Amino acid sequence: MTFNFKEETINSINADFEIILIQDKKIEKYTQSQELFKLSNYKGEGICIDMQNKILYSELKSLEYEDIRLTFANAYKALKKLEIQSVKTKSVVGKCVVNSFNAMIQGFTFGAYEFDKYKKEKTPSKLENIFISKDEINDKTYNLEEACIGINYGQVFSNACDFAKNIVNEIPQIYTPAKMAEDALSLSQNDCKISCKIYESDFLEQEKMQAFLAVNRASIHPPKLIHLSYKPQNPKMKVVFVGKGLTYDSGGLSLKPADYMLTMKSDKSGGAAAMAIIKGASELNLDIEVHSIIGATENMIGGNAYKPDDVLISREGVSIEVRNTDAEGRLVLADCLSLAQDLKPDLLIDLATLTGACVVGLGEYTSAIMGNNEDLQNDFFKVSKKSGDLATILHFNPHLKELIKSNIADVSNTSSSRYGGAITAGLFLNSFIREEYKDKWLHLDIAGPAYLEKAWGYHSFGASGAGVRMCLSYLLYLSRKQK
């Protein structure tokens, strides 16, 4: 899809169709379509297509960024069914020009996304050219340079999300740890600013990453430790992301019920997001050094599987009592977070589809932000609200820490209570964060929104790219803050 920002009036732009945005249900001035409005009982809500005049009317509920995204996503979904190649629209400017244009582009691209790789009959859209006029729907004047920046951001954010979604949607017989490593290498091959190192089992043994290795033990596919890095000249700070890359999670010997095993290809969403963030950071030419460490493995069953009652010694030297092999992601993350701290980051963020408890507590649309530093959490939350990724803060409760105590090891991998599971999982990870990084670490549990079993908002069925936009937005925020 190509986006063309035109410093021209809307009427001077040639396109197959025009999008007209309806605010406050005010449709009276569009005289050319009044007869259609009456026949279709269109009152200014939702979508109405005037084929005769080549106009699509789309409701814009407000100038909030989420409404801008939803409006253009709905418009594209309706238009892609038509035999057209181009469309034009006026600009929409809310509180911030950059964020508004970013939202417009995201709306179009999220509306266009579809994972149909395995469908025999595909219905590709011919709509490729999007023309955006300098004319603003409310006749606002605005900085055209900022508009172009917003369009660029929108394309980078959207491409990064699509990259992550394609990884998460890919099927488990194809998407093994080796395939994840291959995709990581392709990022470095296609972008000279990104470097990639892939580490095998022998490295994990050498580094004493026994928690990570235990999870992989019953899989026929060897584990991969992926380290992507983007290093600009004279970086202002260093940020390290750690992603959970479970390419499939059967639950191990604590086997998941059949219904719960469906969608477990999505347990690599955190790893996919970490890879996509590196891609986006490079395309944005950020002045921040960014690393992504991904622990890629399967969690399978077999005679060699790790077991409940096992005690594992992590890379940090912290011993872990295994009470449930389906709480495996935190074991992989524990060792990966240990390695990440050796990079001496100014900020450390992990992303993981970690707990069903997070979905129970927050619903299917919202990620959880956890950590020890309230100021850091609040900063991240404020930025996330504008990004399109829904998130909220879950505070650590010291009383819940008692629930992951073990009688035979330093910590248990599951809580002794069925309640507060999202927070106890975060507290488990906190056990592997060194004192000097406690206030520099955030844990993002993206279990709810990472994979959608039904479409909602501007998201299609399947992977959503959860975490990518809020992390890229936060990197941009940090870059501006350092200047």
Which stretches of residues belong to each language-model region?
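A generic structural signal for tightly packed, nonpolar segments enriched in small/aliphatic residues
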Residues: 1-5, 26, 47, 181-483
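Short amphipathic alpha-helical segment within the helicase RecA-like ATPase core
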Residues: 1-238, 242-245
